[in-house]
């Protein structure tokens, strides 16, 4: 049983949602974002610290069928990536989901876009069932799945922040526009340490 606030120093109402930090989205992968390898050490450290302070950690994964509609061979915009059960769909080491973490697989149907961690998944219900009120979004890629997940978290009435020191984009030039859009609609922008501290 997850404890409620203990002495005011735990963040059990908070969930860290780590979006799509998978082999195919990292350097050397089929659809790599920029500078992803530099994301891994601070993200791994922050995941451990968030857990230590009582936050729920959620990992989302693109988990596509081989005939997914988003693939170029099927008329979509993207190269084949994150096919269910393949190495490219695995979390990028050293990240690893623990037994206490929530793993959300998205884009699992042929026509499911799966940009958002909330799109045709159980994420909303998982968070509500665990009493979560705050969501911090990190991961890949800022202008696609991070953006979509943050917007859906806000729409679902979670206190939502994008952790701007723990995100990576396909095109860095898009980041200022995306973050400005998110801020305008009510998503908070925060560095990871400040977000964790604010949940106490």
Show which residues each predicted segment covers.
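Short, small-residue-enriched loops and turns at beta-alpha junctions
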Residues: 111-114, 167-171
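Histidine-anchored nucleotide/phosphate-binding helix
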Residues: 46-47, 147-155
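Active-site rim beta-loop-alpha module in soluble metabolic enzymes
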Residues: 107-118, 149
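Glycine-rich anion-binding loop/nest that anchors nucleotide
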Residues: 132-145, 162-167
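Active-site acidic carboxylates
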Residues: 5-108, 124, 129, 133, ...
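Ser/Thr/Pro/Gly-rich low-complexity, intrinsically disordered segments
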Residues: 1-2
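A short, well-ordered alpha-helical element
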Residues: 120-122
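Catalytic-loop motifs flanking and including active-site residues across diverse enzymes
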Residues: 87, 91, 142-149
